[in-house]
């Protein structure tokens, strides 16, 4: 089914955001693991996998709309050098992605591509959940102090 060119462009932009997130979160997860921060490793690793699932959905939708998924134009990874910087980098990436999603959702709705819109709304819910988690973790660092926060990250999630 031939899709709206601008919807496909939005989907490719969102795909690019996901590809950056996959790599950034995966590297952050492994850095956390290397530092012995098991809980942060677990959460970041699962976020990386979630972003991969989002990317897969974008790729399938782009192909369905007879577009070509762009996996070559990757944005810049912002890899932090310490825990707080890493969480802030991830938050900035998520906030930018959510902004792009809202814009794309509005456009898809305006051209009556309700399937793309609904898919993006589902993904936005996931992204907002990750934003909330990141904001909470950064708030905990401020309230508890970094050393107490880090001590709490040694345990495994769950």
Curated annotation (Swiss-Prot):
Which reactions fall under this protein's catalytic activity? 4 Fe(2+) + O2 + 4 H(+) = 4 Fe(3+) + 2 H2O; Fe(2+)(in) = Fe(2+)(out)
Outline what the protein does.
Answer: Iron-storage protein, whose ferroxidase center binds Fe(2+), oxidizes it using dioxygen to Fe(3+), and participates in the subsequent Fe(3+) oxide mineral core formation within the central cavity of the BFR protein shell. The mineralized iron core can contain as many as 2700 iron atoms/24-meric molecule.
The EC class name is oxidoreductase
- Protein name as it appears in the record: Bacterioferritin
Q: How is its activity regulated?
A: Iron oxidation is inhibited by Zn(2+), which binds at the ferroxidase center with a higher affinity that Fe(2+). The occupation of the ferroxidase center by Zn(2+) also severely restricts the ability of BFR to form an iron core.
Q: What is the effect of changing residue 100 to D?
A: In strain: ECOR 30
**Residue ranges of the Ferritin-like diiron domain?**
1-145
In this chain, Fe cation 3 is annotated as bound at 46, 50
Q: What else is known?
A: The internal surface iron site that binds iron 3 is important for the mineralization phase but not for Fe(2+) binding and oxidation at the ferroxidase center.
Query: What is the organism field in this record?
Result: Escherichia coli (strain K12)
Q: How is the cofactor bound?
A: Binds 1 heme b (iron(II)-protoporphyrin IX) group per dimer.
Q: Which family does it belong to?
A: Belongs to the bacterioferritin family.
Outcome following mutation: residue 46 to A? Fe(2+)-binding and single turnover oxidation at the ferroxidase center occur normally but iron mineralization within the cavity is significantly impaired
Gene giving rise to this polypeptide: bfr
Q: Which residues bind heme b?
A: 52
């Amino acid at each position: 089914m031939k899709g709206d060119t601008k919807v496909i462009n939005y989907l490719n932009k969102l795909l690019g955001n996901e590809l950056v997130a996959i790599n950034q979160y995966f590297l952050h997860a492994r850095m956390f693991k290397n530092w012995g921060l098991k809980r942060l490793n677990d959460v970041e690793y699962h976020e990386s996998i979630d972003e991969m699932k989002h990317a897969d959905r974008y790729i399938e939708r782009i192909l369905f709309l007879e577009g070509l998924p762009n996996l070559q134009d990757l944005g810049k990874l912002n890899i932090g050098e310490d825990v707080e910087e890493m969480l802030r980098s991830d938050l900035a990436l998520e906030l930018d992605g959510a902004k792009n999603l809202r814009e794309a959702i509005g456009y898809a709705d305006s051209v009556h591509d309700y399937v793309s819109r609904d898919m993006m709304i589902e993904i936005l819910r996931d992204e907002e959940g990750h934003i909330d988690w990141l904001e909470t973790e950064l708030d905990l660092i401020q309230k508890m102090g970094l050393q107490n926060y880090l001590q709490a990250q040694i345990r495994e999630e769950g």
